[in-house]
Amino acid sequence: CTSEPYQAPGTKRMAQRLAQLVDGINPEENIYLSAHRVAWLRKRPPAKSAVLKLSQQIELAKELLQAGESAAAADLFQTVRGQAGANRLRTRPSLEEMLALSYLRLGEQKNCLDNHNLASCLLPIEAAGVHKDQAGSRSAIHFYSEVLRKSPFDLTSRWLLNIAYMTLGEYPHKVPEQWLIPPAAFAADYEIGRFTDRAPDLGLDALGLAGGSIMEDFDNDGLQDIIASSWGLSDPLRYFHNQGDGRFAEYTSKAGLTGIVGGLNVNQADYDNDGFVDVLVLRGGWFGADGLHPNSLLRNQGDGTFADITEESGLLSLHPTQTAAWADYDNDGHLDLFIGNESSPQQNHPCELFRNNGDGTFTDIAAATGLDVIGFIKGVAWGDIDNDRLPDLYISRLGEANLLFHNDGPGPNGQWHFTDIT
C-alpha cells in the first residue's frame, strides 16, 4: 500500500475551514455560484401564473448557461420561446439573443474544450481553429441574423455573428455585407507575429476559472516552476514542477497542498528570508457578503512541501480580497504585507497592513499607520516615489478615486505613518 503524502497540521486545518465554506454556500444570495444556483432553482416550487412560470424557466435557463450547461440552456430557451408569444412575454436580452449565445457557447465547448488544439479560440480564428462540430455556430448564426433583422444597430450581436462565421471558416466571404466587420478591423498597427500556446505540450493545459499564477523556482534547482489558483470554491491550487526536460509534472499532492482550494489571485515572496520563496493565496474577491474567506500563507519548507501557516503567523482574517503586495516598508530587513480588501455599502472591510515581526508572525498595524482604507480595492503596488528609500503605496479602487500614500517614516514616538497625498 502507499501512504498519503505528508500534510502539515496548519494545512489540514485550512483545508477543513475551506471545505466548511463550500458547505455553507447560500446560492440564493451568491450570484456567482451558478452550478449551485441551478440546483437551488430546480427545487423551487413553480409559480401559479403562466407568466411567472415562464419567468422562472428563463431564470433557470440563464443560470444553466452561466454554469456551462449550454445545451440544456438552449433547449429550455427554445421551450420558453414557444410559449412566450402566447403570453406576451418580452425579455431583455431577448430570447433570440440568449439562444444565439447558448449555441455559440455550445460550439465553443464542443470544439475549443472537448477537441482543443493550439489554434482553438485564438482571434482571428483560422485553419486548425475552425470548428469541426459546426452545429452550435450554425444555430448561433441563425438566431443572431434574426436579432439583427429586428435590431440592425445591435453591435454586440453583429460582432458575435462575425465570430460565429469565423469559427466555421466562412469569414469574411459568407458574412452578409450589411453585417460584415471587415478584416481590416482586425489589423494591428504593428505586426508582432503569432504566439503559440505551448501549454498542452508542457503538461500545463489545466482547466479553471479566473485565478492567479506565479512562475518561480520554488525548490532552488535552477528551473522555474508554476503555481496556479482558480476562483471556484472547490477548485484546487495546483503546483506544476519543472522537470527540466521541457515538461511540467503536477506536484500538488506531493507538496502537501491537497485541500487548499479557491483563490482569485496568488503572489510570492520569501517572507522569512530562508532562501525559499513562499506563496500567498488571496480569496473572497467579488463575492461580497459571501466573501468572508481566509487567505492562505503557504510557507515553503525547503523540502518540496508547503505548510499553511496562516493562523499561527497572525494573518488569519475574513475579508473579500484579490490583491496584496509585499514590501519592507520600515527597512528592518523583513518583508511586510499590505492587503487591499473589498468594502461595499453594506459591509466595511478595511485594508490591512501586516508588519513582519521577524519571528514568523505578523501584526496588523493598518489603523495606526493610516492605511485602514475603505473601498472596493482592486489593485495595490509599492514604490519609492521620492527616492527617500521608503516604499510608498498606490491603491486602485473600483468606482472611486485611486489613492497615493506617502511613507512618512517613524514619528517622534517611533510609530510609522502614511499620508494620503493623492
Explain the meaning of each model-derived region:
Residues 202, 211-220, 241, 255, ...:
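Beta-propeller blade termini
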Residues 24, 79-93, 101-146, 170-191:
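Short coil/linker segments at helix-helix boundaries
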Residues 1-55, 59, 113, 177-179:
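N-terminal leader/linker segments that initiate helical-solenoid repeat arrays
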Residues 53, 60, 99, 106, ...:
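Structural register within alpha-helical repeat arrays
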Residues 213, 225-230, 275, 279-283, ...:
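Hydrophobic beta-strand segments that make up the repeating blades of beta-propeller
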Residues 173-208, 241-261, 298-319, 354-375, ...:
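Blade-edge motifs of beta-propeller repeat domains
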Residues 232-234, 285-288, 343-346, 400:
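Short glycine/acidic-enriched loop and turn motifs that connect beta-strands
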